[in-house]
Curated annotation (Swiss-Prot):
<dbReference type="GO" id="GO:0046166">
    <property type="term" value="P:glyceraldehyde-3-phosphate biosynthetic process"/>
</dbReference>
<dbReference type="GO" id="GO:0006094">
    <property type="term" value="P:gluconeogenesis"/>
</dbReference>
<feature type="binding site">
    <location>
        <begin position="234"/>
        <end position="235"/>
    </location>
    <ligand>
        <name>substrate</name>
    </ligand>
</feature>
<feature type="active site" description="Electrophile">
    <location>
        <position position="95"/>
    </location>
</feature>
<keyword id="KW-0324">Glycolysis</keyword>
<dbReference type="InterPro" id="IPR000652">
    <property type="entry name" value="Triosephosphate_isomerase"/>
</dbReference>
<dbReference type="InterPro" id="IPR020861">
    <property type="entry name" value="Triosephosphate_isomerase_AS"/>
</dbReference>
<comment type="pathway">
    <text>Carbohydrate degradation; glycolysis; D-glyceraldehyde 3-phosphate from glycerone phosphate: step 1/1.</text>
</comment>
<comment type="subunit">
    <text>Homodimer.</text>
</comment>
<keyword id="KW-0413">Isomerase</keyword>
<dbReference type="GO" id="GO:0006096">
    <property type="term" value="P:glycolytic process"/>
</dbReference>
<keyword id="KW-0312">Gluconeogenesis</keyword>
<feature type="binding site">
    <location>
        <position position="173"/>
    </location>
    <ligand>
        <name>substrate</name>
    </ligand>
</feature>
<protein>
    <recommendedName>
        <fullName>Triosephosphate isomerase</fullName>
        <ecNumber>5.3.1.1</ecNumber>
    </recommendedName>
</protein>
<feature type="modified residue" description="Phosphoserine">
    <location>
        <position position="213"/>
    </location>
</feature>
<dbReference type="InterPro" id="IPR035990">
    <property type="entry name" value="TIM_sf"/>
</dbReference>
<keyword id="KW-0597">Phosphoprotein</keyword>
Length: 253
């Protein structure tokens, strides 16, 4: 039985005060960590403070991206060593916005996954197709290619502790979402790729999230599906009430 994981991706939202207020509002109301992992991936500027504010709760704090080098002349970047030094638990890697706006490649994402693992940070590896690819019927081919590239060079026991997030690009922030059956089909295909690369036990252990306009009114159906183990959530993670609703749905899935 895979434990669900709900990860909020705040992107470039919230002031410092708003971020602290959010954590204060949710940290005493979280479902048991035995039932669901609760994660907030906040802007990098806030990470050290949020880790401290949430330290007495079961809320895990994550980053939204990172470099793969530990140090160097990379202006504006944040290293895995720096994230680890402030006790960040998770990091989102390969989000479609990073791929599109910052030209992140599959090769770079693979290096970032390795760097995260080396510092005991759980990578949330994103994959997903464009609307054009979906209409062309190449969704599973595209996603399989991204996953194979991201997982290249790793051992099964490493992959078991990763999180994979399927986010169809056309559904991110658009209000559109894949049907629960469609999302489950692609998440199942991802699990099959993991089995092909490693083995059935690894495929059964790895957690696969769905992301793309996940909201309190559709999360129950999504989480009822066999291959969907949680959600990577944007807008619905910005308000304490909706975030807690998502967590409760996952805890009772």
């Amino acid at each position: 039985m895979r434990k669900p994981i709900i990860a909020g991706n705040w992107k470039m939202f919230k002031t410092f005060e708003e971020a602290i207020q959010f954590v204060d509002a949710v940290q005493d109301k979280l479902p048991s960590n035995e039932k669901v992992d609760a994660v907030i991936c906040a802007p990098a500027l806030y990470l050290p403070t949020l880790v401290q504010v949430a330290s007495e709760s079961e809320l895990a704090i994550g980053a939204q991206t990172m470099h793969y080098e530990n140090e160097g002349a990379f202006t504006g970047e944040i290293s895995p060593a720096q994230l680890a030094s402030v006790d960040v638990d998770y990091v989102i890697l390969g989000h479609s916005e990073r791929r599109e706006y910052y030209n992140e490649t599959d090769e770079a994402i693979n290096k970032k996954v390795a760097a995260a693992l080396a510092h005991n940070i759980v990578p949330i590896i994103c994959c997903g197709e464009t609307l054009e690819e979906r209409e062309a019927g190449t969704t599973e081919q595209k996603v399989a290619g991204q996953i194979k590239a991201a997982l290249a060079g790793f051992e099964a026991q490493q992959v078991e502790h990763m999180v994979i997030a399927y986010e169809p690009i056309w559904a991110i922030g658009t209000g559109k979402t894949a049907t629960a059956d469609d999302a489950n089909q692609v998440c199942g295909a991802i699990r099959s790729v993991v089995e092909e690369l490693f083995d059935a036990a690894t495929a059964n252990a790895v957690r696969i999230q769905y992301g793309g306009s996940v909201k309190p009114d559709n999360v129950h159906e999504l989480l009822s599906k066999e291959h969907i183990d949680g959600a990577l959530v944007g807008g619905a993670s910005l308000q304490p009430e909706s975030y807690l609703t998502l967590l409760e749905a996952a805890a009772n899935a």
